[in-house]
Every structure is written in structure tokens, then in C-alpha cells.
Amino acid sequence: MTSKMLEEALSSHLAASNQLQHLDPALLEVAGRLRRQPPQVAMTVARGSSDHAASYFAYLTMQQVGIPVASLPMSVVTMQQAPLRVSGQAVFAFSQSGQSPDLVNSVRLLRKRGALSVAMVNAENSPLEAASEFFLPLHAGAEQSVAATKSFIATLSASA
């Protein structure tokens, strides 16, 4: 007997394949914008396993693009209302569901302050997608296990 998590991990290659077939137009749009208006700094906002995937994204971005990337504590934006100067910078949000209010509110506030916002979300038509300027769907399919296994692997794939 295999667990749901193992089943989803074993099927994650389908999500990566699906991304290769569908993600290019959205990636090209984001890449074009970043080339026209390159940020000096990028931020990530995420929770749980998505935050771990965001760390991988940050590592790749720093190594390949050369701009610093920091994980932003969402409470600094939402609860403490810190006057962050983010105009012209980029924020990348990562989520399986795109439903977390603190994640959505962080992106909404950072975008209002002038940050380019990109959401990598598995669930389409989510509040996080609506709050972001750009949306990169993960195409992982429905999640059955608690750990969002396919979405985690799909985020790693989309980040690369």
C-alpha cells in the first residue's frame, strides 16, 4: 500500500510535463517585463512547503540573474504596516491554493506600493492570482496529500 504523498510524488513528472506545454507564454510575458524594468531586489512571500520552494527560486535567481532575493516576513507588511520602499522591485508569491489572506494581502500591499508582483499558484482563479500583476500557473493538478507534494515539485520545476 502506498501513501497519497508517495503517489503524488511519483506522478509529479506529469505536472512538469504539463508546465512545459502551457507555461511558456506567461513566462515570456514576465521575462519581458523584467528585462524592460529590471529590479535591483526581489522578495518572496510564501508559507510552509511553498516557502521552501521559494528558497530554491531565490537561490537560482541570485545565482543566475545576480540580484538579491529575500524572503519577506508577511507580518512586516500586513500587521506592522512597515513603510517598505519597493517601487520598481519585484515580489514573487508562491502557493498551492492562493487562498491565504496574509499572503494575498502582502502581495496586494506591495503591488500598491509599486512592486511588480508575480504569483506562482497551483489553483487558478484564486485571490492571490487576482492580487498579482502576473500569474504563472503551476499545472500540478488537484492535491490529495497534506504536504502539497505535486505543487512543491511543480514550483521547483517552474522556478528552474
Residue positions per predicted region:
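Glycine-rich phosphate-binding loops that contact phosphosugars or nucleotide phosphates
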Residues: 37-160
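Cofactor-/ligand-binding subdomain signature composed of acidic, glycine-rich
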Residues: 1-38, 147, 153-157
